[in-house]
Amino acid sequence: MSGIFYPGKLQASDTVGGCIDIFKNVWPNPEETIQMTELACSDPESGISWERATTTDRGVHQTKRTNYHLGISNAAEQGVSTAQNIQNQMYMLLLAAVGPYVEKYGVTGGLWHEPYSMLRYRGGQEYTSHYDGGTETARSVSAIVYLNDSYEGGHLEFTNFGVKIKPEPGMLVLFPSNYAYRHIAHPVTSGTKYAIVTWIRDRQL
């Protein structure tokens, strides 16, 4: 993939709900990313495939999510070139965006990236109301990159703030992982939604 452009620091295009920062058009090749990923997944020899998304942390959210995921970081470690390209691009993007974000909001601690995953939602799949992590998880900042908008539904809603975001191709959303930022990935009623997600921890576990 080409077209990475992350010199210096990225500033948010918009801020809503206190600490929800939206960066528009910061993933330069979203459609190409989807095409390359699906092409790799269609090859049984590629070493990369979609799996049912699971929540292993506390188990309490597993019944709330019905989407599929692709372990980008794990596949990259296994030498899958498509995953390595996505991994590198995501890392560069977060270097440019997360630093200014934590400075802006006075977030303390380290910046430890959890493995990156690509998510796929279709046919009514959703992730109902949840938050990404309490203090025991060390999750400080949540990051979502949206790759397309060729679907119906699939909005991101922060229930405590009355904020609903319509994903756009190449959009990055950063927000606190704590309970105040409980959110919903609404059902995709038509088409397929793709996103890349990770969480930034303030310490190693």
Task: Go through each PLM region and give its residues.
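Histidine-centered catalytic micro-motifs
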Residues: E126-G134
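Eukaryote-biased feature marking scaffold/signaling PDZ-domain proteins and nuclear chromatin regulators
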Residues: G18, E31, D43-E45, L111-H113, ...
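Eukaryotic intrinsically disordered and solvent-exposed regulatory patches
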Residues: E103-Y105, H130-Y131, Y181-H183
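Non-heme Fe(II)/2-oxoglutarate
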Residues: S2-Y105
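Catalytic core of Fe(II)/2-oxoglutarate
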Residues: R139, S150-L205
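Short, conserved beta-strand element in jelly-roll/cupin
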Residues: M118-G123, T135-E152, I200
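A short coil-to-beta-strand element that immediately follows conserved catalytic motifs
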Residues: E103-Y116
